[in-house]
């Protein structure tokens, strides 16, 4: 009875066929008496791939059709079936091994559903890696083995047999299941299984040996992220604990200390701990030995990235920031680089990194921190953690409201216009602005960044270098992740994906609810059959003689009218099967037009003038009659039997009255006045001329309107393009202003460095002069007189013990090279005695002179 208030009513057509109640009773009796030989008898049959023969052989009914064991030829049983199914649909047990999917379906919010956790033998479950990456609702497939040693943990939920009457999200889940699975009946309920031979070879199936998704989910989530971060290994090891090699590579790549998160999350390093035996997995859902509250640093880092992407509205509104690096997150990262990363970081996405590499992590988180500090400067945010989603979105809303940027948007986020305005209004703020510093709360600054002020960090923290980012963070959730100092973030705005690990899949008594519903349906069935057998024959026999002549005169018109549509639903068991009354009503309602209709005043309006009918409708026949208050003063004792003949005649009278009113309305719309014999042709010709003129004007103005709409669309498109170009110019101008300010700072730094270098040169010169090194000092001093310069050079060259400067001058002098050449030529003459050498030397000498 618990399900009766919330399940939709109506005669539905099920997706499973059936014949008779005897077959269903045989199946239920078989379910009660099945023993351990169930899998031995049917294992060979199902192992060959004939999973669904049981549907065709037993033909179990899921819609309630022929549920009560009577043939469809019996009209009594047909009405019993329709009314019973519409009010109280039969229930059955359905087993779902995917506990995570049930949690995402908000199983706990359905107050009328009863469910329990059970163990099923003879089945195996597999995780489909691609479905997890695509965030499908169903990520498991179930396979039948027939081996009693293979056990899985599932949730048994009591739902209507007719799947079209399931709650909305459960119906969508059923449609998704039916794309790759088919139902199989077991003693404990219906289970949806998949033939592994029909699974696509491109899917990676991960066998869950323990049979419980909750046992291996944390390890799978960490390994799945490590694999997508290019830190993990093969897909076959995704269900094992993460290896030290993968964790070390992750720590080295993203600068997260290994000893810190090993000490904080010791359950991740389980290489030395053996797996639990299979018999202990039965109670693993309620096991307290596993710490499900802790979160891996790998998952936490991906969660921070997903929260950052949600600030830019790159993820859907209902997206769960659960730390699972899926395809939607990768797509959002690529879109962020194209829209924001290139503009504010001044670099392209690295091609030698994965989608979420160190450069992306540093750039995305640093941009969020930069915006956070700028919002703090504008006194728009009060949250102590930039990854407190509610506080950060409130800060964005305050800033947009302050500058009039949130007039048309339904959702608050960091759009390009808001970022441009944020960088523009905070660019002129310097670190010496005492008024801005006074507006900031000191505790907030110390909690988030520890040292330094947000004005400096709002300019310095924007980087693509992970080391620079880590150096500039000292608290909050990012500080807790990278340095172990800070407070954990608030996760009240989203439902964690790991909450299903702690959810209690136990409510009510499913067996008791099914038994109660079956007893109630059986009671209704017996009562209605007894009532039908008692009254149907009497009503049919009494009305057959009276209605046979009227039925012979009726037109053969199909009708879907039933007794339930005539009577108020006070007691269905009493009025459901008055078949004689039903036939009398149909005979009266579908009676052909004959002379007796003139007596019952059904067609009174046919014989009246339509012009007078409108005036007649406004007349007052009676007033202050006692019959007007009779229903209020005199109480009716319900139930009472209305007159079906009166109902049929009233319906016909209403039908013809409505038709007459429609006819009158049509005449009023086209009424032109009374025409006489003399003015008939003239008025009609004048009307036709005016009508044609109106048609021409309408066509003319409609063509003009189309031309105007086309021009309007062109102008609108040009305006949109112009606005887009203006936005790009504004963003480029803001970026140029920002770069010019940075360039000015760099120029001032260079000028100061040059001045320091000049001062150092002056000091060096003075020190050399003090030491008495006149040669060097004279070389350093500029010579304005040419004679003095030549004399200084000659002194340096003729010095007996020259210093390094004089030696260089001697080497570079022309006379030194000439002497060296003459000596070389003399040696060659003495050795070879060849005049050609002398001639060549003379030519070389002339060339040197030239």
Curated annotation (Swiss-Prot):
PANTHER family: PROTEIN STB2-RELATED. Interacts with SIN3. The modification Phosphoserine is found at residues 594, 625. This is Protein STB2. Keywords: Phosphoprotein. To yeast STB6. Disulfide bonds: none annotated.
């Amino acid at each position: 009875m618990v399900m009766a208030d919330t399940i939709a009513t109506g005669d539905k057509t099920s997706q499973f066929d059936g014949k008779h109640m005897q077959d269903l009773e045989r199946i239920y009796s078989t379910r009660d008496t099945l023993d351990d030989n169930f899998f031995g008898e049917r294992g060979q049959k199902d192992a060959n791939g004939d999973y669904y023969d049981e549907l065709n052989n037993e033909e179990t009914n899921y819609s309630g059709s022929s549920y009560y064991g009577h043939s469809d030829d019996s009209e009594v049983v047909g009405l019993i079936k329709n009314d019973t199914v519409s009010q109280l649909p039969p229930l059955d047990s359905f087993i779902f091994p995917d506990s995570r999917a049930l949690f995402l379906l908000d199983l706990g919010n359905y107050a009328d559903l009863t469910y329990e956790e059970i163990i099923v033998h003879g089945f195996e479950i597999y995780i489909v890696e691609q479905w997890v990456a695509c965030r499908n609702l169903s990520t498991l497939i179930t396979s039948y083995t027939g081996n009693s040693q293979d056990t899985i943990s599932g949730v048994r939920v009591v739902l209507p047999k007719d799947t079209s009457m399931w709650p909305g999200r459960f119906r969508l889940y059923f449609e998704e299941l039916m794309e790759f699975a088919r139902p199989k009946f077991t003693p404990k309920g219906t289970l949806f299984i998949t033939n592994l031979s029909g699974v696509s070879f491109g899917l990676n199936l991960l066998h869950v040996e323990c049979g419980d998704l909750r046992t291996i989910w944390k390890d799978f989530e960490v390994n799945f992220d490590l694999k997508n971060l290019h830190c993990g290994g093969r897909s076959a090891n995704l269900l094992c604990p993460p290896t030290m090699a993968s964790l070390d590579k992750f720590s080295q790549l993203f600068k997260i200390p290994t000893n810190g998160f090993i000490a904080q999350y010791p359950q991740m390093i389980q290489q030395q701990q053996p797996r639990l035996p299979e018999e202990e997995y039965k109670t693993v859902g309620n096991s307290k030995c596993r710490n499900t509250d802790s979160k891996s640093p790998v998952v936490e880092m991906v969660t921070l990235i997903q929260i950052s992407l949600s600030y830019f509205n790159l993820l859907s509104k209902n997206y769960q920031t659960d730390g699972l690096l899926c395809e939607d997150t990768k797509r959002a990262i690529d879109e962020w680089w194209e829209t924001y990363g290139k503009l504010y970081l001044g670099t392209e996405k690295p091609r030698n990194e994965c989608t979420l590499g160190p450069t992306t992590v540093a750039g995305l988180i640093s941009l969020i921190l930069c915006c956070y500090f700028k919002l703090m400067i504008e006194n728009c945010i009060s949250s102590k953690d930039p990854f407190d989603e509610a506080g950060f979105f409130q800060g964005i809303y305050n800033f947009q409201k302050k500058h009039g940027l949130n007039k048309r948007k339904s959702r608050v986020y960091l759009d390009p216009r808001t970022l441009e305005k944020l960088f523009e209004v905070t660019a002129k703020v310097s670190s010496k602005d005492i008024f801005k510093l006074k507006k900031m709360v000191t505790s907030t600054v110390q909690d988030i960044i520890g040292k330094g002020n947000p004005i400096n960090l709002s300019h310095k923290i924007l980087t693509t270098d992970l080391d620079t980012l880590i150096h500039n963070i000292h608290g909050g959730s990012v500080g807790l992740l990278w340095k172990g100092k800070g407070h954990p973030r608030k996760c009240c705005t989203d439902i964690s994906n790991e909450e299903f690990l702690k959810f209690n899949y136990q409510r009510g008594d499913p067996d008791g609810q099914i038994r109660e519903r079956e007893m109630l349906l059986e009671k209704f069935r017996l009562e209605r059959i007894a009532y039908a057998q008692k009254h149907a024959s009497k009503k049919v026999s009494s009305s057959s003689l009276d209605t046979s002549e009227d039925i012979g005169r009726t037109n053969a018109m199909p009708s879907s009218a039933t007794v339930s549509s005539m009577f108020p639903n006070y007691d269905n068991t009493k009025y459901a099967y008055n078949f004689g009354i039903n036939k009398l009503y149909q005979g009266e309602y579908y009676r052909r037009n004959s002379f007796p209709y003139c007596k019952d005043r059904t067609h009174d309006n046919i014989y009246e003038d339509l012009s007078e009918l409108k005036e007649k409708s406004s007349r007052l026949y009676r007033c202050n009659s006692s019959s007007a208050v009779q229903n209020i003063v005199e109480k009716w004792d319900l139930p009472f039997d209305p007159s079906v003949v009166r109902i049929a005649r009233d319906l016909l009278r209403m039908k013809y009255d409505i038709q007459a009113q429609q006819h009158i309305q049509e005449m009023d719309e086209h009424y032109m006045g009374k025409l006489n014999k003399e003015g008939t042709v003239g008025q009609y010709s004048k009307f036709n001329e005016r009508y044609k003129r109106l048609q021409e004007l309408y066509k003319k103005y409609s063509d003009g309107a189309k031309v105007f709409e086309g021009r309007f669309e062109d102008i609108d498109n040009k305006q949109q393009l112009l606005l887009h170009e203006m936005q790009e110019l504004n963003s480029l101008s803001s970026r140029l202003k920002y770069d010019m300010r940075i360039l000015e700072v760099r120029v001032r730094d260079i000028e100061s460095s040059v001045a320091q270098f000049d001062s150092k040169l002056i000091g060096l010169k003075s020190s050399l002069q003090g030491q008495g090194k006149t040669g060097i000092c004279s070389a350093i001093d500029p010579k304005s007189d040419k004679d003095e310069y030549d004399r200084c050079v000659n002194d340096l060259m003729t010095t007996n013990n020259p210093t390094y400067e004089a030696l260089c001058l001697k080497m570079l002098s022309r006379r030194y090279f000439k002497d060296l050449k003459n000596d070389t030529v003399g040696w060659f003459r003495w050795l070879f005695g060849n005049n050609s050498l002398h001639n060549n030397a003379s030519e070389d000498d002339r060339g040197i002179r030239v």
